[in-house]
C-alpha cells in the first residue's frame, strides 16, 4: 500500500486547539470493524459498551515538560525537545537552532542551568546536564508541555493538567497517550463498579509519533522506537479475560502497540515485556491480543491511522473519517474519540 492511500483533507477548524471543559464531554464515533457500521455517540456512552468481565488496558505514562529554551555559549538561541531520558543526567533530544551545537559545546538553559553536547546520533543530540539536580527536576523547573505542532499555540498553565491523563504514573513521555485524556476519575470508578477490570501498561510516547512518514510505500517506513513495559500481572489478567470469553479493550494506540509488542516478542504467546519496541502495525497485521480499542482521530498519512485501518479494515476506517469530517468531529490530541471493534480475519 502507498502512504498516500491514507490521506484525507481536513478543514483547519476541525483541529481541536483546546480540550473540552469536561474530560468526558467529547463525542464518540463507534465503528464496527466487521460491518463498518457507524454510531454517533457521546463519550460517556462508552460505559454501556464495555461489558462486565471485559479488561480495559490503559497507558500510565506521564508526560514530562519536555520543551526547553536556552542559548548556545556563542549567543545563538535554541529550543530543545527531549526525545527520551537516558538516565538522571543525560537525554536524547531534538535541537532547533540556526546552527547545530558542536560536541563539547555548552548550552545555557533558562533558569541558569547548563548542559553539554556530548554526541550526535543521526538527527538526535545527546546532552548531559551539568548540575546536582536530575533532568526531571530541571524539566519541572523550566520545561514547557510539549504540545503537538498542529495545536499551534504556546503552552498554557492549564495544559500541565489537561495534556496528562488522570492516572499518569511513570514520567517519560513527550506526547500524551491521548485516548486516555477523556477519562476522569468518576468514569473509571463507574467502569469498576460495573465489573470491568482495569490494568495498566507503560509506553513512553516519543516525539517521533508526530514525524511525518517520508516514504512512498508503507514497507519502506522505519518506525521510531519507544520504551514499553507490560508487567506479568497484566499478562495474567489478559489470559483470564480471554479464558472467560471476554474482551481486551485497549485505550489508545500506545496500549495496543505495547500489548502487541509483548506478543510479538514471544512469537504470539503473550509474556511480560520490558524494553524498546519499534512495532509498526499496518493493514495485513494479525492482532494477537486486542479485541476493541478507544482512540482519537489521527493525522492523515500517519502510522496511527494505518494501525486503526489494520484493526477495523482500511475501507471502514477511511469511510469513518469522512463521516467524522462531515459531522464536524474534533480531530487530534484534544479532539473527540472513536470506539472501534476488531474486524475478524
From Swiss-Prot:
Pathway: tRNA modification; tRNA-queuosine biosynthesis
Domain of life: Bacteria
SUPFAM superfamilies assigned: QueA-like
Intracellular or extracellular location(s): Cytoplasm
HAMAP family linked: QueA
Assembly, per entry: Monomer.
Protein name as annotated: S-adenosylmethionine:tRNA ribosyltransferase-isomerase
Gene of this entry: queA
